[in-house]
């Protein structure tokens, strides 16, 4: 709570992407984060569901998006390739841009970019590698 309030005060124009996994407990935690963002007047850009698939199920992101009255930006599948690329320090979107997971992540990023408020401060980060 205190950290979130401090961040909102330090970054009053920040925009929030709420990330959850399909499980109900994760949705509850992410819901509290989203409500904290709203209570501190931070704009919620949308919700991302992570680790979607056979192991954890799906639908938690959509339920949370509805609860927070925010768009569902996308559902990222539980993909071993995503972990493997993270372990070697090369983003999946760079190493395997044609993979389903990479395309979903790029789609989420493009949606976030398109939804930015006018006057948002954007700083490009170079890809290392």
Question: Language-model segments: what does each one mean?
Answer:
Residues 1, 5, 99-102, 106:
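Alpha-helical membrane and juxtamembrane elements of multi-pass inner-membrane transport
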């Amino acid at each position: 709570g205190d950290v979130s309030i401090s961040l909102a005060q330090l970054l009053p124009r920040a925009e929030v992407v709420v990330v959850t996994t399909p499980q109900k407990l994760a949705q509850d935690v992410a819901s509290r984060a989203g409500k904290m963002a709203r209570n501190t007047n931070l704009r919620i850009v949308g919700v991302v569901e992570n680790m979607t698939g056979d192991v954890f199920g799906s639908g938690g992101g959509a339920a949370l998006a509805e609860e927070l009255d925010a768009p569902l930006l996308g559902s990222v599948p539980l993909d071993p390739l995503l972990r493997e690329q993270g372990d070697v320090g090369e983003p999946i979107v760079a190493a395997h841009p044609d993979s389903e997971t990479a395309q979903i992540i790029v789609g989420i990023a493009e949606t976030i970019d398109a939804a930015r408020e006018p006057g948002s401060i954007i700083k490009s980060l170079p890809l290392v590698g």
